[in-house]
Amino acid sequence: MTTELPFRLFDCDNHYYEATDAFTRHLEPAYRKRAMQWATVDGKTRLLVGGKVNKFIPNPTFDPVAAPGVMDEYFRGRNPKSADPGKLFGELEPIRPEYRDRDARLAVMDAQGMEGCIMLPTLGVGMEQALASDLPALAAAFRAFNRWLDEDWGFAYRNRIFAAPYITLCDPGNAARELEWALDRDARFVVMVPGPVTTPTGLRSPADEAFDPFWRLANDAGITVCYHGGETAYARYLGDWGESDFTEAFRASPFRSMASYDPMQDTLASLLARGLFHRFANLRIASIEVGSSWAFHLFEKLAKAYGQVSHLFPEDPRETFRRHVWVSPFYEDDLASLLTLAGEDHIVMGSDYPHVEGLTEPASYLKDLQNFDYTARQCQAVMRDNGLFLATRRPA
């Protein structure tokens, strides 16, 4: 049953399934054996990254693939038979045209009542750490990826599909050049994963002044920088507890589901503590597909830190956060408390369509908001107005 909305929605978390040549079509020849390759291993098509089989996605060809939203209940914390996550996919189906074709996707968006969306990677958010030991290859891989993305999806197609080029900060000069290139092609968003940045001299905060050329461009152009969940540098810490130190999608682990490490919380803490938003007062940050529980923990720590060392902050960092950060909560989160913390103008919906953990029907997000007594005006702000605001450049 289709959920009827009194407005056309803007979804801040839509995904494509990458073409098999997304990383290779435009890859510079010097990096063909150092970045992404396809190989047949034991009769199966496998993705090699840096010469090693990569298992971030069980089937990175995405054909066949599970239907949208089949694990909705699991991610709401409901799995009464304790079925293995891999068994919840149901019958796989051939890849649908709209997962890879922008015009087919527009037709689906029309049927969904969707005005526009941020279009984000599936495989791409798991690749940065896989190449962290070869930073030139990492930078080259995402240069190639972004050119594929521009070619197949565009960065502002019909002013409705806003595909976000992926920026790795591992090489500050390359990051600034990539952003300049994307801005010339009307990019409204860029995407990266949270956590410290791997550089030739070690891990560094993304707010380190070495990355100011990138942040200055983002600030001056008035785009939105999205932090999206994915494979981060934090995965290595799980190894310290005897867990796998790399992510395999949908492989269950009790400890992984409870561990308190939080790259999104720490990333925002670092951006605030190191004064990024006061160096660049026009920055807009959106957190996507990392939920919102981290924001509550962060606010507790910000309040205490400001109470202890207020002289080290230009202002209460919670107020800085509220000006510069937009949060896309999981639909199963405490949406009422988030409204108090962030305000209705800084919450954006994200359906995660067509992923298995997302919503089968993006418009049904409305029901989750209504369950927390959001007013009609607040629902429209979260499901339309705020996303459109972020998709509009706001030059400094």
Regions flagged by a language model, labelled:
Residues 87, 91, 131-135, 200, ...:
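A short, mixed-charge helix-start or loop-turn motif at secondary-structure junctions
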Residues 17-20, 25, 117-119, 125-131, ...:
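Short catalytic/ligand-binding loop motif for oxyanion handling, primarily in non-cytosolic enzymes
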Residues 111-113, 124-153, 172-181, 201, ...:
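Active-site loop-helix segments enriched in His/Asp/Glu that coordinate
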Residues 2-10, 19-116, 147-155, 177-180, ...:
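Mid-to-C-terminal alpha-helical segments outside catalytic/metal-binding sites
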Residues 15, 122, 195, 231, ...:
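Flexible loop residues that form catalytic
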Residues 10-17, 226-230:
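Histidine-centered catalytic micro-motifs
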Residues 140, 159-161, 167, 173, ...:
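Catalytic pocket-lining loop regions of alpha/beta-barrel enzymes
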Residues 86-97, 107-132, 160-168, 188-192:
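Divalent metal-dependent hydrolysis catalytic cores, especially in the metallo-beta-lactamase
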